[in-house]
Amino acid sequence: GKTWKAYSLDLKTNKDELASAEAELHGFITDLNNLPTDTSDESIATIKAFYEKWFDMDFFLKTYAINILLGMDDDYWGNGNNYYLYFDTGKKGTGKLYFIPFDYDNTLGCSIHEGDFLQNPLEWGRGKNRPLMDRMLLVPEFKQKFVDYLYEVSAEEAAYEEPVYEE
């Protein structure tokens, strides 16, 4: 849909605070959609400030690197679904938004899309308009960290480390 009201909000916690949750989500989506799409220094600074305000960037980038490693294309970036946004902005919260993917039945080669494992991980969404990822990748620092995490989670030694057992 063209507006955020076209989508349903399935509040999982604090259900008595639906109105404020809707307002917070609306503000986030509006700000995200109004971010610049060019790569001027001023635009990059604006985009970076937005992401650093809303996200724990290391957590977000690591989450998406793991999503890609698992071949999770039935998600926000691929199909625009199967994720939660958790706003930890209450009195005792971190003030951050957490992106939480779910529904991993189409992973590890069980995808309806052939050759997902051959895709460039920086173009995972197959050209779809996904402002959350598109804007983030415009920031060189975030893009590089994302690539670094992709290498880190796919490194052979990361998958085959000997477990350490305490006696």
Language-model regions: role of each:
Residues K12-K15, A19-E22, N33, G90-E167:
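C-terminal catalytic region of ATP-dependent kinase domains
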